[in-house]
Amino acid sequence: MKKRLLSLTLAGLLAIGAFTGCGSSGSDTKDTKEAKSTQEDSKEEDTKAGDKGTITVAASATPHAEILEQAKKILADEGWDLEIKVFSDYVQPNLVVESGEFDANYFQHIPYLESFNKEQGTHLVNAGGIHYEPFGIYPGTKASLDELEDGDVIAVPNDTTNEARALLLLQDNGIITLKDGAGLEATVNDIAENPYNVEIQELAAESVARVADEVAYVVLNGNYALQAGFSVAKDALAYEKSDSEAAKT
């Protein structure tokens, strides 16, 4: 129960941080500014980081740990000490929460969480949604989807839900067609039509970007795209839309 409350606290304060980062309207009066200043001074006197306890969070480097570093300042004002540890894969962050070594993690979407629980027998729960990172198709040896040729190789993540997102994105762009109802559990076995005879190379999510100079295209999770120096807006040849099935999870 304590871990659940800590996780909910973190999720809530992350949301507060997002709103705070948008800036003020600039319409504060002198009185409201003075009132805010008084409240902040009182808060600083009454609350110190760690007074309420420590929250330990496992996260992927980009952008999750970066977001947490900003949230750390807000949490400190609320009396919490936030300890962040960066992991490079999608397995250990869940295992350290399951074992009780960490209070929470920040890196995954709900379908992956549910799939992990099912496959690993873990008991993790969603503490709250924070933000959405779209999957994207990024250039490898080909600079445009118009250059797609028969037999090209496309690298995708190999874990259940992220592979499905990659395949759904390829389908949305006319590269393959999946069996009806495959959805977020789709695998390469669900490819019904492959007009370009593309070869799907399945790799651990953290390894996909590393083969960009060896394959025609790579399909990347948002965080690994950022780590590889890709921008969804500038570099993605195609990406998940805000109303996609994955975006609703």
What are these regions (language model features)?
Residues 129-139, 226-249:
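Periplasmic-binding protein-like
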Residues 98-108, 152, 175, 196-199, ...:
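Alpha-to-beta junction loops
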Residues 50-62, 80-86, 153-154:
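Short, well-ordered beta-strand elements
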